[in-house]
Amino acid sequence: MAGNSIGQFFRVTTFGESHGSALGGIIDGVPPSLPLTEKDLQYDLDRRRPGSSRYTSQRSELDTVEILSGVFNGKTTGTSIGLLIKNTDHRPQDYEKIKNLYRPGHADYTYEKKYGFRDYRGGGRSSARETAVRVAAGAVAKKYLFNKKNIKIRGFLAQMGDVHCNLKDWRQVNNNPFFCPDLEKLTALDTLINNLQKSGDSIGAKITVIAENIPIGLGEPVFDRLDADLAHALMSINAVKGVEIGDGFSVITKRGSEHRDEMTLDGFNSNNSGGILGGISNGQPIIMHIAIKPTSSITVPGKTITRENEETQVVTIGRHDPCIGIRVVPIAEAMVAIVVIDHLLRQRAQCEKI
């Protein structure tokens, strides 16, 4: 299987399956002498991990990360950093009854048609469980970016179903299980999730990520544009079906006189472009939105086919999220951080004195 790595100067490779013994990864390109401990990575892993609230999957993984290499006496050495996260609450027996059929909306069908064989235990490699290592790698990137350039990368739940969450207070995002910055919407979110859990259904979400203090000049025209790489990274997250940067699809109804970001000696008058012009960062905050589909692992019966090409019904058994978007926030932050640090290192290599 190809496609297990992302990045050029800062390169992340992951391995492992949902119900295998462990997940792991290798990070190449981390600059030396960055203070780093497992505690630095664990914070974001705890934000992502399942079983952390009654609103998410009750699979109870501690997601304890172990740094195997690349760190000595509390600092990075500049060599490859090896990471390991053991699976401690995997239950492959939950999938025995559905191993010979394809779960609609999942990668079961496409994986088997592509490879001729698949790991049916929770989706194997296609499971969002894989993203735990991405979050750990992203934590390394976030620490370097903040320490060296004061770059902040933060995300929040912008919408779940019909409930819209306004960015009122960043401080509240990590103080509630929804990553919601709008405390007035917590009751509505709670009601929505409770109703979904009772009905056995799920719902989609919109996540917003904002990267601040980005220096001007990150991005490599033409094919490695910063926005192209960000879209690539965000689309690689399980269940993401759409990416917007800046005004995104709302530009369809706007006039050029309205959308262009006019400039004065004091700076830009607006940020409709989302901080990127011509594929290169312009110094403004980079604003991204992603659409998360509702998980297909639900207890509502659905039509499907078996490996023997017979029609049947499926009712998903196991522990699943009524809204996977709740746990995507730290994953999206991680992917943005991985792209930003990669382009920062590329810029330093090519244009250090500029």
UniProtKB/Swiss-Prot annotation:
GO biological process, one term: amino acid biosynthetic process
Binding site for NADP(+): 48, 54
Chemical reaction(s) catalysed: 5-O-(1-carboxyvinyl)-3-phosphoshikimate = chorismate + phosphate
Assigned EC number: 4.2.3.5
Cofactor(s) the protein requires to work: FMNH2
One Gene Ontology term of the molecular function aspect: chorismate synthase activity
Involved pathway(s): Metabolic intermediate biosynthesis; chorismate biosynthesis; chorismate from D-erythrose 4-phosphate and phosphoenolpyruvate: step 7/7
Residues the record lists as binding FMN: 125-127, 238-239, 278, 293-297, 319
PROSITE patterns: CHORISMATE_SYNTHASE_1, CHORISMATE_SYNTHASE_2, CHORISMATE_SYNTHASE_3
A GO CC term attached to the entry: cytosol
One Pfam family it belongs to: Chorismate_synt
Source taxon at top rank: Bacteria
Keywords on record: Amino-acid biosynthesis, Aromatic amino acid biosynthesis, FAD, Flavoprotein, FMN, Lyase, NADP
NCBIfam families referenced in this protein's UniProt entry, alphabetically: aroC (TIGR00033), PRK05382.1 (NF003793)
PANTHER family according to UniProt: CHORISMATE SYNTHASE
Recorded family membership: Belongs to the chorismate synthase family.
Subunit and interaction comment: Homotetramer.
Entry protein name: Chorismate synthase
Gene designation: aroC
